[in-house]
Amino acid sequence: MTTSPGTVESTTPVSGQLRTVLSAGERPARATAVSATLTHLWRAMMAFKHFPVQLIDIVLMPLIFLLMFTYLFGGAFADSTEEYLQFYLPGVTVQAVVMMTVYTGTSLNTDIHKGVFDRFRTLPFWQPATLAGSLLGDVLRYVVALATTVFLGLLLGFRADGGFLGVVGAMLVLIVFGFSVSWIFAALGVVASEPERVSGTSMIVLYPLLFMSNIFVMPETMPGWMQAIVDANPMSHAATASRELMHGTAGFWDVGLVLCVSAGLVAVFAPLTMRLYRNKNAH
C-alpha cells in the first residue's frame, strides 16, 4: 500500500511549526549548586539499596575488631576485659569511621573508569556537585558504623558516663573528622589508575596511623620515639576526644584540635580534589 504525496506533506511538520511547538513550553531552570549536590547525595545513598553488601562490611568490620581485641587481648592490655572495653570502645569508633573513608576513593574511581563521570560532564549542572554529593552520602556510612559499634559496646557492658549527649557529641566530632579525611582519598580516587590501587594505597597509609596511635593501647607502654609519633598522630587526638566526650571528662584541647585538623584537611584537599577533577575532565 502506498501513501499519496499529499498525505505525506500534510503530516510532515514544517520548521516553523516545529519551532513553535518546542518553544511553547517553558524550559526548566538550570539546577543550582545546592540542588545538584543534593541529587548526587541521594544517588550515593541509593547505593545502599542496590548494593546492600556494603552494609555488611560497614557493620561487621568494627564489630569484629571490637570483639577480637576486647576478649582476645583485653586481659593482656588491661586488668580485665571490662576495663579494656571502657578504654577501647571510644577508640574503635575512630577506627570504624576512618576505615569507611576508603570507600570514598574506591567508589569515585569506579565511577570514573565506568564512564559515569563522562556522562555527568555532558550535563548542565555544577560539576563539583558530583564529588560533594558523594562525600556527603558517605556520612551515612559513618553513622551506621558508629551506631552499631556503640550499641554493641553498650550490650557488652560499656558505661558511657557522659550520657546520651556525650555519645552523640563524640559521634558528631568523628563524623566531621571522617568527612575531612575522606577528601584525601577522594583526591587519590580521582588520580588512581584503578580502584584496587586506591584501596591498596589507603591501607598502606591507614594501618600505620591506626596502630601507631592510642586507639588500642596507652602510649606509656610504647618506646619513647613511638610515643612522640603517637602524640602527633591526629588519630590519637580523635580517640582521646571520643573518650573524653563519652566518659564525661571532655576538655577543649583535644576536641578543638580535632576540629581544627578537620578544617585544615578540608581547606587543603577539597580544592586540590576539585582541581584534579576539573583537570581530568578537561582531558
From Swiss-Prot:
One of its GO terms (cellular component) is ATP-binding cassette (ABC) transporter complex. The keyword DNA-binding does not apply. It is found in: Cell membrane. Residues 53-280 form the ABC transmembrane type-2 domain. Disruption phenotype: Deletion of the drrA1-drrB1 operon decreases by 31% the daunorubicin (DNR) titer in cell culture. The drrA1-drrB1 mutant exhibits no growth defect compared with the wild-type strain and no significant change on DNR sensitivity. Deletion of the drrA1-drrB1, drrA2-drrB2 and drrA3-drrB3 operons almost blocks DNR production in cell culture, suggesting that disruption of these operons impairs the efflux of DNR, resulting in intracellular accumulation. It comes from the Bacteria. It is a multi-pass membrane protein. InterPro entries: ABC2_TM, ABC2_TM_bact-type, ABC_2_transport, T7SS_ABC-Transporter. The complex is probably composed of two ATP-binding proteins (DrrA1) and two transmembrane proteins (DrrB1). Part of the ABC transporter complex DrrA1B1 involved in daunorubicin efflux. Responsible for the translocation of the substrate across the membrane. Confers self-resistance to daunorubicin, an antibiotic produced by S.coeruleorubidus. Belongs to the ABC-2 integral membrane protein family. This is Daunorubicin resistance ABC transporter permease protein DrrB1. It comes from Streptomyces coeruleorubidus. The lineage of its organism: Bacteria, Bacillati, Actinomycetota, Actinomycetes, Kitasatosporales.
